[in-house]
Amino acid sequence: MKNKVLENLLDESSIQQQVPFSAGMRFPHLKVPANACDCHHHIYDRRFPVDPNSKLRPPDATVADYRLLQKRLGTVRNVVVQPSTYGVDNSGLIEALNQFDFATTRGVAVVNTSVTDAELKKMDIAGVRAIRFNLSQPGGATSMEMVEPLAERIKAFGWHIQIVANAEQIVTGADIWNRVPVPVVIDHLGHVLSVTHPSFGIIVRLLKRGKGWVKLSGAYIRSKVGPPYSDRTVVAKAYVKEAPDQLVWGSDWPHPTAKIDDKPDDALLLDLLAEWAPDEAIRNRILVNNPSRLYGF
């Protein structure tokens, strides 16, 4: 019996050590509720063609690799986000969704105005529930000008738009976010560096109307102080205080903007949620109820 217990402990330790693109080996201190959802991660697969204009070219980060992360974090549901690496070729995303279970997985695609209704329908069947606009990279596959026409196209599917943009672009696009006929999900805390920045007020007003959502993700991306990212905690706590029912959490694994030898610790990133949202009932909404509403689990 003792040998069996030791064997199980060794198995758990090896799982932690084998999670690629994630620093650290421990399990999170935060025990997540049943059906907890990681609402933002990517899959990279060299079998699929890259966009020649893309800037990020990370190594393969597969479905099998991600499942190891799920074991470490305790999350069950997940949302696969099309990376900028592949532009508007969503074949890798669809392949990844097919490898996951539809009951627990949804996807976010990247398209431009040339996408056909048949292609959108195929994505919908596969589990796609949103399209993403990466406005932070000039010359990328999408642009601000595409947001409104494509939002009109996806309205019939009940999808939303997802925006990754810097704080200034959030301000520039304020009228667009208010006009589009679908929900607006803002990545990575909106890249807001201070609650006094005008972008924070714009986002909070969207949240309070029920029109906007924020992903509590990517704390490491804009942090100037490093782990445990106390400078991002101020902004995250402010979102939780203002609109807890319009927030979801995401790991951003495999952390494509971080250097290969400087990946964040995903256990720490999850544990931050306990600091950002000390109330367990609110955390459970962020991890379970809110993703269920947004992605249709």
Task: Label every PLM stretch briefly.
Residues 1-35, 59-77, 244-246, 260-297:
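Mid-to-C-terminal alpha-helical segments outside catalytic/metal-binding sites
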Residues 90-108, 239-243, 265-274:
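Short, electropositive alpha-helical surface patch
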Residues 51-86, 104-110, 128-136, 159-161:
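Divalent metal-dependent hydrolysis catalytic cores, especially in the metallo-beta-lactamase
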Residues 9-15, 144-249:
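Catalytic pocket-lining loop regions of alpha/beta-barrel enzymes
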